[in-house]
Amino acid sequence: MNNTIKTKAYAAFDESGEIKPWEFERRPVEDDDILIEIKAASICHSDIHQEKGHWGKQQYPQVPGHEIAGIVTQVGKNVTKFKVGDKAGVGCMVNGCTTCENEEQYHPDTKFTYGYAEEKEPTGITQGGYSTHIVVRDHFAVHLPDGVSFEKAAPLLCAGITTYSPLIKADIKKGDKVGVAGIGGLGHMAVKIAVSKGAEVYAFTTSADKVKDIKGFGAKEVIVVEDPKDLYAHAGLLDYMICTIPYQFEIAPYVATVKPNGFFTFVGMPVGFEVTLSNIGLAASRVNFNASLIGGMKETQEM
């Protein structure tokens, strides 16, 4: 293919998830695209799930990574949003609907950053950010502030927006009691974002060794969960909870910590995308239960 972009990367070659050096070619830069030289790509738990086939059969070789920060080195002739030399970030989407008013992630034409069928790509699928370069539709890249390093910006492109979007939609206000369940990559972002909105944050973790760090993020209280049933002691404490736990667990005790008619948002993605719910557990709490997937481009730039 003419004008393809020679790229070095780390790719998974099978469901072991082990990544190894690999060289491949990306599609050419088209009129609405930009080419980014990648300076930092952070690791998301999604990378592990997908490369190990936890979310379904994969095509290999596959380059993971959807938390990407770098410098624009080429722009298509129609691009006005970016110029060569700009700092840019790419998250979980690289192409698709450009008129979806902040809901691009829910459009059926959306091309996610790696592992998705794409006839324009020489490898037949999109390839992610554990690589030297990436070609992306300009709409699906964001400007990065000059004062933020590539390393610090990269995790915001998935972990950040995945928690920012539902917290903003929940209209968190000063003094609201917000719970964050699961304090990993997403959870620590959720704590910081909720604190920045003036919320009283209650963090729920199974890892006692994280308590000091979580308090440092600004959480009012850290609850170490040894037995989920102990959570009923905190029933009705919260106005809102965001849950980032990425595996099967007892959900009802966590939901019970939210006040009746409050909201519980699930952003964790367990193996097989499946969770087990107790209907009576939800009914007894009368909590509004919903889920959220990353965020749109407008709110990503806002974040």
Question: Language-model segments: which ranges?
Answer:
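Adenosine-nucleotide cofactor-binding segment
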Residues: 174-183, 193-253
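Glycine-rich beta-strand-centered segment in the early N-terminal region that forms part
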Residues: 25-41, 54-101, 143-148
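N-terminal Rossmann-fold NAD(P) dinucleotide-binding loop
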Residues: 187-188
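Short glycine-/small-residue-rich Rossmann-like dinucleotide-binding loops
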Residues: 42, 76, 93, 227, ...
